[in-house]
UniProtKB/Swiss-Prot annotation:
Protein name per the record: Small ribosomal subunit protein uS2
GO CC entries: cytosolic small ribosomal subunit
A Pfam family of this chain: Ribosomal_S2
Record PANTHER family: 30S RIBOSOMAL PROTEIN S2 PROKARYOTIC AND ORGANELLAR (PTHR12534), SMALL RIBOSOMAL SUBUNIT PROTEIN US2M (PTHR12534:SF0)
Keyword Manganese: no
Alphabetized InterPro entries for the sequence: Ribosomal_uS2, Ribosomal_uS2_bac/mit/plastid, Ribosomal_uS2_CS, Ribosomal_uS2_flav_dom_sf
Gene3D superfamilies on file: Glucose-6-phosphate isomerase like protein, domain 1, Helix hairpin bin
Species of origin: Salmonella typhimurium (strain LT2 / SGSC1412 / ATCC 700720)
A Gene Ontology molecular function term of the record: structural constituent of ribosome
Encoding gene, per UniProt annotation: rpsB
Cytoplasm keyword on record: no
UniProt xrefs under NCBIfam families: rpsB_bact
Keyword annotations of the record: Ribonucleoprotein, Ribosomal protein
Length: 241
């Protein structure tokens, strides 16, 4: 199973927190100290906590669970999309729309509209419209694709959230809490760990650190899914005998 070592984390700068004046006292147990007015995260805590989170995500994906990757900050946006796509999972990487989980019924209607517009753009419907109407629908399609493209094939609520930056994505975390969906999150020294089921104390800004987390999670999910496929194949083999 995918694991991450302390050396990997040091190289990626996972240990660099935020400036000391911005700290959240609830993160005190995970802080090693401060250097040049920047908090240093205790990687002796982070390494086992991250590997424990990976083990749990592996189990969820082995049970065919759906993982929703959430990271809407510009620095993380593209990496979040790539990681989710690389393991056939789902993502929100632009803006979290309030109610995305708690008001799933309405979201489902918007997804249906998105899929209808996609069909229209491909089957020649747009070409039959006036230029103005075609442009309006193209813009609507782009807007919906931006906000819902990463969850359009999710087919229901996710089984877990993997979040980059607990502070920035606090609305998503609150919605998941309300629905009892487990939250795995990167929590920096300025963030509140409450509401996060699997806290991973670490830098949430450095692109190398973000890429390290996402790469490890995607690899773990792929492994979990292949275990599931292997057990399915075994079952069908037994049935065939």
């Amino acid at each position: 199973m995918a694991t991450v070592s302390m050396r990997d984390m040091l190289k990626a700068g996972v240990h660099f927190g935020h400036q000391t004046r911005y700290w959240n006292p609830k993160m005190k147990p995970f802080i090693f100290g401060a250097r040049n007015k920047v908090h240093i995260i205790n990687l002796e805590k982070t390494v086992p906590m991250f590997n424990e989170a990976l083990a749990e995500l592996n189990k969820i994906s082995a049970r065919k669970g759906k993982i929703l990757f959430v990271g809407t900050k510009r620095a993380a946006s593209e990496a979040v999309k790539e990681a989710a796509n690389s393991c056939d999972q789902f993502f929100v990487n632009h803006r979290w729309l309030g109610g995305m989980l708690t008001n799933w019924k309405t979201v489902r209607q918007s997804i249906k509209r998105l899929k209808d517009l996609e069909t229209q753009s491909q089957d020649g419907t747009f070409e039959k419209l006036t230029k103005k109407e075609a442009l309006m629908r193209t813009r609507e399609l782009e807007k919906l694709e931006n906000s819902l493209g990463g969850i359009k094939d999710m087919g229901g609520l996710p089984d877990a959230l993997f979040v980059i930056d607990a502070d920035h994505e606090h609305i998503a975390i609150k919605e998941a809490n309300n629905l009892g969906i487990p939250v795995f999150a990167i929590v920096d020294t300025n963030s509140d760990p409450d509401g996060v089921d699997f806290v991973i104390p670490g830098n949430d800004d450095a692109i190398r650190a973000v890429s390290l987390y996402l790469g490890a999670v995607a690899a773990t999910v792929r492994e979990g899914r292949s275990q599931d496929l292997a057990s399915q194949a075994e079952e069908s083999f037994v049935e065939a005998e």
